[in-house]
Amino acid sequence: MINKIKNLINLNNLDGYIVPKNDEFFTEYSKINKLEIVANFSGSAGFILILKNSNHLFVDGRYTIQAKQQSEKKFIIHEIPYEWPKDILKNDARLNIGFDPKLFTTETLKIYFNNSCNLFPVNSNLFKTRVEKINKDNLVYRINTSIVGESSKSKIIRLKKILESEILDNLFISSGENVCWLLNIRGKDLPNSPIANFQAILTSNKNVILFGNIKKLKNIKKEFLKNKISFYKKNDFFKILSSLKGKSFCIDGKTCSVFNEKLISSRFLIKKRVDPINDLKSIKNNTEIKNMIEAHIKDGVAVTKFLYWIKNSNFKKLDEIKVEKRLESFRKQSKKYLFPSFDTIAGSGPNGAIIHYRSNIKSNRKLNKDHLLLVDSGGQYKWGTTDITR
């Protein structure tokens, strides 16, 4: 993949190209770990800068050890926030750096480069995914009000009032997480999180327009139409945008890509602010609080069974991978359990000191009564998410 990127650099008369961890929805998780493909780095955060004569991997302090181990000396490791691309480019003549405009925001580019180079958008499709087959296992589904405590209709009304109070005509909801919260929907587009990858617009006439893979809406199309929620393919975004009324458009600078910002700004006056849904969803109602407690009780039962099993097992026959699988089996005993909320960290001895460690065939260690065992894990349940470390 490094050679492919360097070919892209040469074809476009560039001096470098930057690769982020995120996908176009800017969530923590994505189906493809681009950093692992390029640098063999499996951590959950970071980015890569490929120059003609050097390769650079930027990670935070959690991952410096892991990055050095996995990148196999093919990359220079930089620790953020102490080093950014702008710091290694400042002594060069202004270089031409390419980026995918669907994977970066203007705010992120400013932090990384701060006018230290010339930036060029390149629609590369370097990490183009296969066309996903739609089946009953990856369809979008609705969450009952009994679980979330508030109907989507009520949430939309509250959101409308915020826009009206700030004299904003349209709102672009670029975060898939926020779309799921607003419409009380869930999906299976990401590992470890029940998110459906959709974006939406709340229009000046207060209708909701959804953009994404509409084939996944098969089971809820009728309900959406009944509630005046329309839906289109991602490629229809600009066409729909051109038909909207109003003068202003609110976007979240942290999750609206350079690509979408340019499309919106060609037609509307942009107002940047944190997506108001962020505040709305962070204040939990009584039903959500009750269900979160219930999820932690169920998860606590699973972890208690696991700890009892560990205490009464023969350590000589156990290793990190066996521990991880056994803990998962206890969680699966609950009918409301969905899947892990993140990759389980089961680190024996020195492996427990590696932040966000993930055991594999090469690193898997046997348990030892004289060594600490760190287990950091969590579960996604139908009514809550957990994270527990022991």
Residue spans of the language-model regions?
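Terminal amphipathic helices with adjacent charged low-complexity linkers/tails
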Residues: 115-134, 256-291
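Conserved catalytic alpha/beta cores of large enzymes that bind or transform nucleotide phosphates
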Residues: 220-275, 281
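Amphipathic alpha-helical
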Residues: 15-19, 317-342
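Generic, well-ordered alpha-helical scaffold segments in large soluble proteins
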Residues: 4, 8, 12, 115, ...
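Short, charged beta-turn/beta-strand-edge "cap" motif at the junction between a beta-strand
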Residues: 24, 103-105, 178, 255-256, ...
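Short, compositionally biased
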Residues: 112-113, 385-390
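N-terminal accessory/capping or targeting/presequence segment of soluble
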Residues: 1-92, 104, 108-241, 298, ...
